[in-house]
Amino acid sequence: MLSVAARSGPFAPVLSATSRGVAGALRPLVQATVPATPEQPVLDLKRPFLSRESLSGQAVRRPLVASVGLNVPASVCYSHTDVKVPDFSEYRRLEVLDSTKSSRESSEARKGFSYLVTGVTTVGVAYAAKNAVTQFVSSMSASADVLALAKIEIKLSDIPEGKNMAFKWRGKPLFVRHRTQKEIEQEAAVELSQLRDPQHDLDRVKKPEWVILIGVCTHLGCVPIANAGDFGGYYCPCHGSHYDASGRIRLGPAPLNLEVPTYEFTSDDMVIVG
């Protein structure tokens, strides 16, 4: 009954005044012993009585904000004026300090700042990615000593006319042929319609008397024999491919002409291949 009275709000004084105890219908198992001469209770006058009149003096007499409902307990909200509301103005941009302004007025400034941060971040990421890719690619490139071996210098005066000399270049055989005037005229007179891989002799040489070729057969990679075959050029003993003095395929299973590497004449007596 006390809990109901506490939750009843403004009806609590009425309910507490009309509350009374009602004896239950069950009888206790053990009969209480009533003394023959009951003693009168002694009241401790030093302790205050918890009555409505004594507690009314301790109630808050200032204006309160109270909320009362039928199914909820009564609640009281006090006004705390000593609580300091945190201010985050130092962390906010100047464009958004005024809370009364519309967000559309500061949208351009906010977007500009966002674009600036995005642009700077993109440039930084691109620069870091460029350095990473450059280091990765440079680690796979050939070193200086390997690049030095990628080129070979050949002294042409050591090769007599009508002879072919073989060199090793990048792990492959390199043929340098000093042609005679007869061979030059013979190869220049060949019609392109007779060739499997049509290519004029002048398109394969920089100087008519010098022919520089990679000595690897275009069929299965065998090394041809110089000054041999039906056309007086090169002959592959593996499957019988015949090349002329310009390195063009004339007979046999090879599909293409012998490869011409990149070379440059530095002088009349020196050529650099590679």
UniProtKB/Swiss-Prot annotation:
An example Gene Ontology CC term for this record: respiratory chain complex III
Binding-site positions, [2Fe-2S] cluster: C217, H219, C236, H239, S241
Pfam families membership: Rieske (PF00355), Ubiq-Cytc-red_N (PF09165), UCR_TM (PF02921)
Catalysed reactions, as listed in the record: a quinol + 2 Fe(III)-[cytochrome c](out) = a quinone + 2 Fe(II)-[cytochrome c](out) + 2 H(+)(out)
GO biological process, one term: respiratory electron transport chain
Cofactor(s) the record lists: [2Fe-2S] cluster
SUPFAM superfamilies in UniProt: ISP domain, ISP transmembrane anchor, Non-globular alpha+beta subunits of globular proteins
Positions of disulphide bridges: C222-C238
Record bears the keyword Mitochondrion: yes
Membrane topology of this protein: Single-pass membrane protein
PROSITE patterns per record: RIESKE
Cofactor note: Binds 1 [2Fe-2S] cluster per subunit. Fe-S cluster delivery to the Rieske protein is mediated by components of the iron sulfur (Fe-S) cluster assembly machinery that reside in the mitochondrial matrix (including HSC20 and LYRM7).
Compartments where found: Mitochondrion inner membrane
Origin superkingdom: Eukaryota
Membrane-spanning ranges: 104-140
Molecular-function annotations in GO: 2 iron, 2 sulfur cluster binding; metal ion binding; oxidoreductase activity; ubiquinol-cytochrome-c reductase activity
Residues in Rieske domain copies: 187-272
Entry comment on modification after translation: Proteolytic processing is necessary for the correct insertion of UQCRFS1 in the complex III dimer. Several fragments are generated during UQCRFS1 insertion, most probably due to the endogenous matrix-processing peptidase (MPP) activity of the 2 core protein subunits UQCRC1/QCR1 and UQCRC2/QCR2, which are homologous to the 2 mitochondrial-processing peptidase (MPP) subunits beta-MPP and alpha-MPP respectively. The action of the protease is also necessary for the clearance of the UQCRFS1 fragments.
Keyword line: 2Fe-2S, Disulfide bond, Electron transport, Iron, Iron-sulfur, Membrane, Metal-binding, Mitochondrion, Mitochondrion inner membrane, Respiratory chain, Transit peptide, Translocase, Transmembrane, Transmembrane helix, Transport
Chief place where the protein resides: mitochondrion
NCBIfam families found in the cross-reference section: Rieske_proteo
Miscellaneous section: The Rieske protein is a high potential 2Fe-2S protein.
PANTHER family (alphabetical): CYTOCHROME B-C1 COMPLEX SUBUNIT RIESKE, MITOCHONDRIAL
Protein name in the entry: Cytochrome b-c1 complex subunit Rieske, mitochondrial
Encoding gene per record: UQCRFS1
